[in-house]
Amino acid sequence: MKNYHTHTQRCYHAIDSEEEYILAAIKAGYTELGFSDHTPWRYHSSFHSSMRMEEDKLQNYVETLRALKEKYKGQISIKIGLECEYFPEYMEWLKETIDEYQLDYIILGNHYDETDETGIYFGRPLTKQQLTKYVDSCIEGMKTGLYSYLAHPDLAYYDNLDAFYKQEMMRLCQVAKDLDIPLEFNLLGYETCRQYPNETFFKIAKKMGNKVIIGTDAHESSALSNQRIYQLAYQYLNRLGIEPIEEIRFLR
């Protein structure tokens, strides 16, 4: 098993240290574990986000994982990444940060429009216009070529799963397919009964021929030991005719 959606206590809404996640993954039989804690951003204002690490903690995050990667070499492969939104005005900083820290990968977790300083949260009930903005933002992000996969692609909260919703999700899925970017089936959302995973969305993904990857979205180390929810997710996807993949494209 492999998982590339793992958080740590640094993001303020997860618990447990990097090493605790690694030990849980080894015990559960994972062969590769990728860490993708919420990225800091170098905001133009004095805004402080309560759901991501500060920029001055990033170096220690990377150094800690590199040391643990060496410590557990031969037992498990460790990849170092971040979960990032697509914030156009901050993308140059993100590219520089990826290169500076030689990150293995990043995933696109598109929580906010433009920036979480002032932008709307896409996981709240959306209007048609806001749903279109979500899809547009995901598409623009995927087209950068930076992201290894799209996390919780069905995060967008749109109550009426009507023809408009399906049209917009088809638009998203088509670009993901064209760019060979996998779509994540999110175990945290599945276990906690959020609006995602959305069966309507994954039926569209199946019809469009998208690749689907299971992401634990672990916010505590015990999530990596939950084989029951993992098997239920496999059964869910198999019922839809989807065989999830495990491999992703790395930046280096």
Where are these regions (language model features)?
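Short amphipathic alpha-helices and their capping/turn segments at secondary-structure boundaries
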Residues: 18-31, 89-103, 134-144, 171-174, ...
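Mid-to-C-terminal alpha-helical segments outside catalytic/metal-binding sites
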Residues: 227-252
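Domain-core and long-helix interface of multi-subunit machines
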Residues: 107-208
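Short, hinge-like loop/turn segments at secondary-structure boundaries
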Residues: 51-53, 124-125, 201-203, 230-233
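Hydrophobic alpha-helical segments and helix pairs
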Residues: 76-121
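An N-terminally biased module of ancient metal coordination in phosphate/nucleic-acid-related enzymes
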Residues: 1-84, 93, 159-173, 180, ...
